[in-house]
Amino acid sequence: MAWSASQYVKFEDERTRPARDLLAQVPLQKIRRAVDLGCGPGNSTELIIERYGADGVSGLDSDMNMLEAARKRLPGTAFVEADLGSWQPMEPADLLFANAVFQWLPDHLDIFDRLMDGLSPGGVLAVQMPDNLGEPSHLAMEEAAHAGPWKTAFEAKSVRRKGLPAPSAYYSRLITKASRVDVWHTIYNHPMADAAAIVEWVKGTGLMPYLAHAGERYREAFLADYLQRVEKAYPKLSDGRVLLRFPRIFMVAVKG
């Protein structure tokens, strides 16, 4: 699945706010080495640099389009192509920071085990993930997938993202290698211009696998069907806008 940095940054302020909120809970005063895991176009990497300085900060991503955008944004920072499913720090890191990436990796609890091993004593694993599969925006994706002439493709193979484990599962796994684990949810309510703006938002993330699976032949028809469902699910407010409810889960683990 190819990502588009230009599509992703259309709502950069809204996407960056959770990264800012996550970083605010990292209890490190200074770092020698920090890695932004799934750095995307570098918006979260930039936050880390603003707080700690550029020395020792790097980013990694599996998508070349995102990496090119990150390198253009922060030309003095090292950005590396890597697969988070198998990546391991070559030397201990003080901060491993992951903003909205691990929801795409179903086995991320096992990956967290490995990442905790890659931290220096007192180092921090900080993670944020969307927890929104039960929201109308994502339920409508599944409804649309099984409603049109493209449905046979989705019946043969589901592209629905796997749901996240319970907060207790994260705590129980992380605390085995941590002296402190904080897990919390935040629900953001984003005012959007209209339902079409919600569609434009998810085109950069959650809707991507659905559009890819529908194929070029049905892409526009799928989008039209999905938009109609989103319009019904998100009624207009008094000023004509709609409100996108967006739950996210956060966790900060300090290695013992």
Swiss-Prot record:
Transferase recorded as keyword: yes
E.C. numbers: 2.1.1.144
Compartments it resides in: Cytoplasm
Catalytic reaction list: trans-aconitate + S-adenosyl-L-methionine = (E)-3-(methoxycarbonyl)pent-2-enedioate + S-adenosyl-L-homocysteine
GO process annotations (BP): methylation
GO annotation, cellular component aspect: cytoplasm
Keyword match Transferase: yes
InterPro entries: Methyltransf_25, SAM-dependent_MTases_sf, Trans-aconitate_MeTrfase, Trans_acon_MeTrfase_C
UniProt GO MF annotations: trans-aconitate 2-methyltransferase activity
Keywords: Cytoplasm, Methyltransferase, S-adenosyl-L-methionine, Transferase
Family assignment from sequence similarity: Belongs to the methyltransferase superfamily. Tam family.
This protein's name: Trans-aconitate 2-methyltransferase
